Amino acid sequence: MTQMQQTILDAFNFRHATKRFDANKKISESDFNTILETGRLSPSSLGLEPWRFVVIQNREIRDKLKAISWGAQGQLDTASHFVLILARKNVTSQSDYVQHMIRNVKKYSEASIPATEKKFDDFQTNFHINDNDQSLLDWARKQTYIALGNMMTSAALLNIDSCPIEGFDLDAVTQFLTDDGIIDEAHFAPSVMVAFGYRETEPKDKVRQTQDDIVEWLE
């Protein structure tokens, strides 16, 4: 095994779902910016980046979230950094956001845009993504989990702990974020939370199925 291979596997063995962090230990600005950059640079379907990362350091906001996030009780109190990942709504070829991405970010030529839009529409139709608003949002939420995984892995490579969190009242969190002006519900919806910091106690040994249990080779 090469040194790089060992480093990668060590990071995955290090990572665990940390329920409580050492509240006295804080992640450096440089390290946390690296974690955010791995989220920003993550792949997404058609490269549309249908996400937003809200870093919640405000204690009052954390306390309000704690009341409606049953799976984040220890993390909201102790995490060095707490991130809410939002999924973008209405990601269709004619939406203002997609038009912005293809024209201003990706800078496609005007001549190529109609073909790009058709390819996008055909893809969403074939996968039943654009059947309704909920299927569109579900697709966008899938993309946020790619960024989530990359952020947690990069944290582990920096010896920083993390915990992904789905344990929250979706409707209540959405209402709170909307009422407090944190999100525009017309354009974004909560997808997943993730906490970062340094473990308070050592975890139990990692338990996973073997490769033989989960991998099938077709040769």
Curated annotation (Swiss-Prot):
Record key words, sorted: Flavoprotein, FMN, NAD, NADP, Oxidoreductase
Superkingdom field: Bacteria
GO molecular function: oxidoreductase activity, acting on other nitrogenous compounds as donors, with NAD or NADP as acceptor
InterPro entries: NfsB-like (IPR033878), Nitroreductase (IPR029479), Nitroreductase-like (IPR000415), Nitroreductase/BluB (IPR050627)
Gene3D superfamilies, per database record: NADH Oxidase
EC number per UniProt: 1.-.-.-
GO CC terms: cytosol
Keyword field contains NAD: yes
Protein name: Putative NAD(P)H nitroreductase SSP0379
